[in-house]
């Protein structure tokens, strides 16, 4: 299970730059709007909206922006009607890729996504071609400065977590999506600061990439991250730390 949060952490560091912040806000606003449209504007009764708002607050999104996004979703303000699309395919070295999109123009999005895959030497596949390789899980990341593994095991497992793992520079708590909020709440109630918390797709197995393929994969993920219509992407690539550090 090693490396679940590696790319999320890298994206988080990159996202701290001012040049990236506007793009991050755009994607968060889309997610908040769609979450409010589908489940209503009350974060207490809408888990998806609650997660989106938490992510927005973690990025210091202004309160006015956040509230406007919710109102656009509930129809209190006029907004764009986004469609959710999932693309599946293969990247460098044949790694499996899932790409989640929110778009107001499906033709534009498929053209952009297809181009990104093609440029990386990959291709978009048929529905279901790689989704079976991933499990939907809650993922909570905690710095080793915040807690120790025994404490997290006690707090997490008692609240319904499936596993607690040592990932070198941090601990990861894995949950069933249905237990995510309860486990997250228990960790916070114990006074432990959470570094990152999200419901994500975790690969059942990973494909190791080395050398040029690994470098190509990092550039591919960068391109996916830069596409406005792509909200999230997941892969089963296992990339050496030194490749990340060198790029």
UniProtKB/Swiss-Prot annotation:
- Listed GO CC annotations: cytosol
The biological processes this protein is annotated with in GO are: regulation of DNA-templated transcription
Q: InterPro entries from the entry?
A: Integrase-like_N, TACO1_YebC-like_2nd/3rd_dom, TACO1_YebC_N, Transcrip_reg_TACO1-like, Transcrip_reg_TACO1-like_dom3, YebC-like
One GO MF term on file is: DNA binding
* Annotated keywords: Cytoplasm, DNA-binding, Transcription, Transcription regulation
Task: Answer yes or no on keyword GTP-binding.
Answer: no
Q: Where in the cell is it found?
A: Cytoplasm
Which SUPFAM superfamilies does this UniProt record tie to the protein?
Answer: YebC-like (SSF75625)
Record carries keyword Cytoplasm = yes
Q: Which family does it belong to?
A: Belongs to the TACO1 family.
NCBIfam families registered for this protein in UniProt? PRK00110.1, PRK12378.1, YebC/PmpR family DNA-binding transcriptional regulator
User: What HAMAP family would the database entry show?
Assistant: Transcrip_reg_TACO1
What name has this protein been given in UniProt? Probable transcriptional regulatory protein HRM2_04000
State the organism named in the record: Desulforapulum autotrophicum (strain ATCC 43914 / DSM 3382 / VKM B-1955 / HRM2)
């Amino acid at each position: 299970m090693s490396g679940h949060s590696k790319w999320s952490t890298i994206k988080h560091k990159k996202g701290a730059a001012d040049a990236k912040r506007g793009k991050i806000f755009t994607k968060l606003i889309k997610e908040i709007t769609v979450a409010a449209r589908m489940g209503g504007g009350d974060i207490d009764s809408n888990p998806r909206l609650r997660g989106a708002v938490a992510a927005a607050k973690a990025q210091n999104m202004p309160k006015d922006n956040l509230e406007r996004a919710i109102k656009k979703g509930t129809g209190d303000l006029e907004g764009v009607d986004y469609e959710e699309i999932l693309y599946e395919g293969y990247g460098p070295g044949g790694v499996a890729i899932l790409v989640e999109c929110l778009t107001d123009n499906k033709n534009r999005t498929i053209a952009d996504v297809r181009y990104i895959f093609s440029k990386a030497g990959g291709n978009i596949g048929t529905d279901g071609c790689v989704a079976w390789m991933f499990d939907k899980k809650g993922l909570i990341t905690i710095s080793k400065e915040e807690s120790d593994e025994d404490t997290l095991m006690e707090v997490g497992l008692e609240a319904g977590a499936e596993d607690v793992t040592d990932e070198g520079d941090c601990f990861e708590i894995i949950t069933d999506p249905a237990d995510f909020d309860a486990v997250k709440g228990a960790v916070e109630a114990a006074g432990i600061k959470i570094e990152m918390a999200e419901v994500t797709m975790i690969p059942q197995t990973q494909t190791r990439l080395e050398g040029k393929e690994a470098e190509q994969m990092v550039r591919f993920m960068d391109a996916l991250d830069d596409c406005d219509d792509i909200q999230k992407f997941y892969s089963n690539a296992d990339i050496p730390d030194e490749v990340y550090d060198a790029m």
